[in-house]
Swiss-Prot record:
This is Putative nickel-responsive regulator. It holds the Pfam family RHH_1. Ni(2+) binds at H79, H90, H92, C98. NCBIfam families: PRK00630.1, PRK01002.1, PRK02967.1, PRK04460.1. HAMAP family: NikR (MF_00476). Coiled coil: none annotated. Its cofactor is Ni(2+). Gene3D superfamilies: ACT-like. Chain A, domain 2, Met repressor-like. Binds 1 nickel ion per subunit. Belongs to the transcriptional regulatory CopG/NikR family. GO terms for biological process: response to nickel cation. Keywords: DNA-binding, Metal-binding, Nickel, Transcription, Transcription regulation.
Amino acid sequence: MGETVRFGISMDDQLLESFDRLIEQKGYANRSEAIRDLIRAAQVELDWEEGEKEGVGTVTLVYNHHVRDLSDKLTEQQHAHHDQIISALHVHLDAHNCLEVLVVRGKARDVRRIADELIGVKGVKHGKLVMTTTGEGLH
C-alpha cells in the first residue's frame, strides 16, 4: 500500500449533507473511508466494462425444477464451464422452485457471457449476475 495523501474536495452543501447521511446509513467511520470505497467501486466497475481483467461474479438463478429438461440443461451448461465455475449452491425454495448460486471466476467478459448463457436458458424465472473483484490490484 502506498503513502496516504490528504486532499480537499469542494461540493454543494446539500450534496455534502446527503453524503453525510449516506455515510451514517452505511456505517462508515468517516468521509475518507466512504470516498475510498466509492473510488474502489468505480475501479471495479471500469474493470468489468473493459472485460480483460480477471474478476469474480455470482450468478443467481431461480427456476421451477419441474420444467422439462431444465435442470439437465443448467447442469450441462455448468459442466461446459467447469474451469470457470468454482462453486455452486443449490437450495430447494419450496416443492417446485429452486435457487442456484454459482461462483464464476475468469476474465470479466467471459464471466458475463457464462452468466448470460445460464440466465437465458428457457425456463429460468429470474437470473442475476453480481460482479466483483478478486481484490488483486485494489488498494
